[in-house]
Amino acid sequence: LLKKSYMPNSRAHWQKLFDPKAVAVIGATPEPQKVGYSVLANLLRGKKRDIYPVSVSQTEVLGLKAYRSILDVASPIDLALIAVRADIVPQVLVECGRKRVPFVVVISAGFKEAGEEGKKLEAEIAAIAKKYHISLLGPNCIGIMNGRSDLNGSFAVEKPLPGEIAFVSQSGALGTALLDWANAHNIGFSKFVSLGNEAGLTELDFFEYLATDSETKAVLVYLEHVSDGEKFMALASRLAKRKTVVVIKAGRSARGRAAVASHTGSLAPADAVFTAACRESGIIVIDSLRDLFNITRLFRLGIRRPLKRLVVLTNGGGPSIVASDAIDSSPSLELAELSEKTKKKLRAVLPPMAAVGNPVDIIGDASAARYQDALKILTAERDVDGILVMLTPQMMTETLGTAELILKFSKKKPLLPVFMGGAAIQEGVAKLEEGGLGNFWFPEDAIRALEALSGSRKKKARVVPTAPTTPSQLRPMEYPAMEKLLRKYGIRLDGTLVRSPRGLASACKKLGRGPFALKVVSKDVIHKTDAHGVALGLSDISAVKSAWEEISRSIKKKHPKAKISGMVLQKMRVGKEVIIGMKRDPVFGPAIVFGLGGIFVEALKDTSLRVAPIDAKAAQMMVKEIKGLKLLQGLRGEESVKFAALEKLIVNLSRLALSDPKITEIDLNPVMATATGILVVDARILR
């Protein structure tokens, strides 16, 4: 991909960012309160590199010779870290360009997040980076870190420990909080990237790089906005095929989106569309920072793929019941069924009072040796994917010895330690941290993390098509043009357009016996029902004519300037009501919605969503994942609807939506689904 960073996608080039031989710190200072001091000091604490402080006021900084300009440095520079006032950055960046520095990290703030003047400055540095082919990270970021190469090119308090997790974040503050927590729990990182305002490099560049980074096994991402929806899905899919990718997205609520806009100057895509795009790309979406931290624990345990069948091993009944309830209520986890052979083995080594079902309760006086006996048997059980090892402190509890055994048996099967308590368990917890496993303080945290990893905690993508927020700018297509467009894509509208009352008699005769429905056709009336523009259950031609007059009066009263193009006459149809629609997302493009219609769409919002294009397989999944599927399959002897017809309609609507970028919304509502096919009873297309 050729992006605004103009960055060659080669390992050697990326090496200059993540393991540079020569680094310049522009804005280096001996004053500890300033960013330039912290960045330089952090670099000096790491692996030996050639480090060049650049300062217009100093000849020496932290024992190193300082240069007035990066141009005064004779040696080539791989990476420049800029920590000067925002208004000076353009000049400094030009000097980096003249020096042919391949990577520049602008840590300085005061750009688009600060208002119009800052926005102009950011556009200027983006143009400079483009001119000189500089791969620019930032501005307004913490910096760059690599736990594997001992690089801390940031002003974070600590550097990351070596590990196999990459963290890519549009929030520097969240990054430093996660880093501090991770260091306290002995969790390492391969790469640690603060994106800042993304004037050059974006999350997409790092998705592309990390897909082939052998040092990274899992990727955590914090996003406030997406720079390019189509490329996001393509690169995220590629990354997710090779690594486990977990994203937490901020700006989901209306209030949250407003905070995002003020913080980064970017608009957030709709939550439901973002979630659908991630799901289609194979990315796990989580809802909370707590889930983010707990999934990081799972990655440290080496758990990067979902576990399903769990055993709870405990020395306390109460906590294990809580854990069992949480597992039982999970859509993606289950308590493993232990074989009679396994239960017999457990009975042979455990006290008579012990419970050998699941949970396996080895009772309160359990020693480390008893935990060992149980773990030896359970870790050999093929039908068990993982074990929650719970411990509560009693007088005879051997927390340290038990922790040592857990470390030993964790090499045979995934073990999730849950040592509950405080001071009495600290020695054991410290041993678990030291050994690289760590501890979940509550069983719910471990279970939530496993659920999130399986995707079952992921918020389901659901939206209900609504009227546009700016109806004065968006108008429905005229009925004949809409009918023609729908027909072109294999979507036939039910009913007959009648231009005047004179045509009602022949239209009724053509349709046969009633009851009938009559609906106004006007590009000036978006919501027909609200304007009393719909009449239902009309028994004969006389009732139809009366309804025409009543609808005409209502429209004239509600919308005096509205032009009525005619009315659609239909037979009242029987079937299962569904809704199929499209809303064009500004980031990801057409989002297709399917769900139950009628009262269900308003009251239950039972819908599924995908980003176009949608093929037959995706359409089938959309239909099957709504909660009301059984209503469509038929209850108490009812016939099932014709699912193939529904799925074909979804695919055709996806094709239509992609054909014209000016179309902002499409509603097919209701669509009557029956055992023999479908009927599109009403439609609306907004352009």
PLM ranges: what are they?
Residues 2-687:
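Catalytic-core regions of core metabolic enzymes
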